[in-house]
C-alpha cells in the first residue's frame, strides 16, 4: 500500500470488505459530504487493495447521505430515500433510512447480487427507485404469466435510468421465471439501437449476448431455435401483417419500450382502400399470443388514454418528473411560452392541427403515409423567409435582454427539418456575425 489509512466504517461480508463508509461531522462547517467523497477517492489511491471486493461506497455528514460506486463521480452518488419503496416521505433522506433501506441483511445481499452491474467500464449501482420498481415488476410479471399476460406499465420519467432499469429487470427475470426468452420491442430504429447498445454493454451481468432481429422471418428463426433464454431486440414495424404465429410458447416476455406509442390493439378500415388494417400492437399479440407483456415508458400517459392500461394492465410503479428532480436524478425543466406572430390563414392552421393529431396517435403505416403527403406543405410554411426572420429576431432579442448575463451553459434550437435548421443558422449569423464561434448546426442520425 502507499500509506496507512483508517476508514470510518468498513462492512465485511464473509470476511470481504464490501462497503466503505466515510463520515463527516455535521457540526463542523469546513467539512461536509463533498469532503467525504474526496476522502474516499484518496483511500482508493492510497490503499487500493481495500477496494478489490468493494460493492459500493457511502458518504455522509448525517444531513446528506449518499451511496455510489468506485467509478462514480460525486454527482452520481445518490440518496436512498425509502425503506419499503414508498415515495410518500422522500423529501429528506435520513441517515437511518439509508442504513435500514440498504443494509437489512437480505436486501444488502440482493443489491450486491442483482442491482450492481458494469456498463462498459462504469460500475453502476441501482437507485432506490430502480430497486423497488424492478422488484415490483418481477412480481407483477410472474403473476401475469399465470393469468392474463398483462404485466403492467413501468413509468419512470425520462433521464431517471429507465434503460438500466430494463437491464436489471431482464437480469432478474432469468432466475424468477426459469430463463424465459425476452423480446424487447421499440418503435424506431434509432431507439432500438440505443437500447440494444445499453444491453450489449451489460452482457456479463445478463449472462448472455442480446441479438437484433433483422426481419419477421429472422425473428421467427431466433424464437424457433430455442425453448428458453435469449434477449431479442426488434422494432414494431418488423411485425408486418401475417396470420402466422411466430411462437406459441408461454415462457416469452415482451418488453415494450415507450409502450404508449405503438402498442394499441385495434383494427381499422382504410377509407381509401377498404382494407382492414391492424395496429402494430394487434399484430404483435397475434404473433406471440401466449407471451406476457410489460410496458415501459418515460412519458405520462394521458388520463384519456385508456388503451395503454387496457393492453398492459395497471401501473407497476410511477417515478415522475417531480420526484426525479427532487432526488437529483434529472434536471428541472421550465417552460415559458413564446408567441411569434405569423400571417397564416385558417386553412393552414387547420392543416397543422390535423398533422399534430396524426403525430400524437400511434405511428401506424397508413397514418404515416397520409401524413407524408402534407408535410411538404407545412415545411414550406415553417421554412418561409419571413417566418425564419421573425423567429431569429425574437431569439436574439430574448437572449440579449433576458439571458446573456444571467445564465451560463448551452442553448438548443430544435428545427422542423435540416434545411430549416440551416436557414436559422444563416439568419442568426446575418443578425449577429460575431456569434460565428458560438453557433453551430448539429444533425441527428435520423430525421
Question: What residue ranges belong to the model's regions?
Answer:
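Conserved helicase ATPase motor motifs in RecA-like P-loop NTPase domains
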Residues: 158, 260, 281-304
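Conserved RecA-like ASCE ATPase "motif II neighborhood" in helicase/translocase motors
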Residues: 228-283
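Conserved RecA-like ASCE P-loop NTPase motor core of nucleic-acid helicases/translocases
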Residues: 154-156, 180-188, 409-417
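Interdomain helical connector at the RecA1-RecA2 junction of SF1/SF2 helicase-like NTPases
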Residues: 306-408, 425, 429
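Conserved motor-coupling elements within RecA-like helicase/translocase cores
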Residues: 214-232, 245-249, 447
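Conserved helicase motor "Helicase C" RecA-like lobe of SF1/SF2 P-loop NTPases
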Residues: 418-443
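Structural recognition of the conserved hydrophobic beta-strand(s) that form the central parallel beta-sheet
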Residues: 58-60, 232-234, 254-255, 292-297
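ATP-dependent helicase/translocase motor core
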Residues: 1-181, 190-206, 227-231, 249-251, ...
Amino acid at each position: 500500500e502507499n500509506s496507512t489509512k483508517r476508514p470510518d466504517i468498513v462492512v465485511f461480508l464473509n470476511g470481504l470488505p464490501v462497503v466503505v463508509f466515510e463520515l463527516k461531522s455535521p457540526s463542523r462547517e469546513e467539512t461536509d459530504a463533498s469532503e467525504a467523497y474526496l476522502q474516499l477517492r484518496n483511500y482508493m489511491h492510497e490503499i487500493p487493495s481495500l477496494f478489490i471486493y468493494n460493492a459500493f461506497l457511502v458518504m455522509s455528514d448525517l444531513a446528506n447521505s449518499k451511496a455510489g460506486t468506485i467509478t462514480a463521480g460525486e454527482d452520481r452518488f445518490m440518496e436512498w430515500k425509502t425503506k419499503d419503496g414508498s415515495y410518500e416521505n422522500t423529501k429528506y433522506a435520513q441517515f437511518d433510512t439509508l442504513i435500514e433501506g440498504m443494509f437489512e441483511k437480505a436486501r444488502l445481499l440482493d443489491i450486491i447480487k442483482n442491482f450492481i452491474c458494469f456498463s462498459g467500464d462504469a460500475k453502476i449501482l441501482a437507485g432506490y427507485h430502480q430497486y423497488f420498481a424492478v422488484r415490483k415488476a418481477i412480481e407483477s410479471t410472474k403473476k401475469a404469466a399465470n393469468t392474463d399476460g398483462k404485466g403492467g406499465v413501468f413509468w419512470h420519467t425520462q433521464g431517471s435510468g429507465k434503460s438500466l432499469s430494463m437491464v436489471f429487470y431482464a437480469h432478474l427475470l432469468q432466475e424468477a421465471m426459469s430463463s424465459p426468452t425476452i423480446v424487447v420491442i421499440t418503435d424506431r430504429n434509432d431507439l432500438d439501437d440505443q437500447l440494444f447498445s445499453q444491453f450489449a454493454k451489460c452482457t456479463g451481468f445478463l449472462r448472455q449476448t442480446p441479438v437484433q432481429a433483422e426481419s419477421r422471418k429472422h425473428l421467427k428463426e431466433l424464437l424457433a431455435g430455442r425453448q428458453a433464454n435469449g434477449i431479442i431486440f426488434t422494432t414494431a414495424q418488423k411485425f408486418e401483417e401475417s396470420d402466422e404465429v411466430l411462437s406459441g410458447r408461454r415462457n416469452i416476455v415482451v418488453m415494450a419500450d415507450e409502450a404508449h406509442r405503438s402498442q394499441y390493439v385495434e383494427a381499422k378500415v382504410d377509407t381509401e382502400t377498404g382494407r382492414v388494417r391492424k395496429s402494430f400492437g394487434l399484430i404483435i399479440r397475434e404473433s406471440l399470443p401466449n407471451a406476457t407483456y410489460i410496458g415501459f415508458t418515460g412519458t405520462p400517459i394521458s388520463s384519456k388514454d385508456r388503451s395503454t392500461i387496457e393492453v398492459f394492465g395497471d401501473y407497476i410503479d410511477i417515478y415522475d418528473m417531480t420526484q426525479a428532480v427532487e432526488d437529483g436524478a434529472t434536471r428541472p425543466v421550465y417552460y415559458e411560452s413564446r408567441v411569434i406572430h405569423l400571417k397564416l390563414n385558417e386553412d393552414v392552421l387547420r392543416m397543422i392541427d390535423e398533422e399534430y393529431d396524426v403525430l400524437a396517435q400511434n405511428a401506424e403505416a397508413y397514418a404515416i403515409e397520409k401524413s407524408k403527403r402534407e408535410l411538404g406543405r407545412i415545411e414550406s410554411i415553417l421554412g418561409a423567409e419571413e417566418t425564419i426572420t421573425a423567429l431569429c429576431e425574437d431569439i436574439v432579442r430574448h437572449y440579449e435582454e433576458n439571458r446573456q448575463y444571467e445564465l451560463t451553459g448551452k442553448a438548443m434550437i430544435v428545427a422542423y427539418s435540416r434545411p430549416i435548421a440551416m436557414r436559422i443558422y444563416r439568419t442568426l449569423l446575418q443578425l449577429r456575425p460575431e456569434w460565428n464561434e458560438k453557433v453551430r448546426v448539429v444533425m441527428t442520425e435520423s430525421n
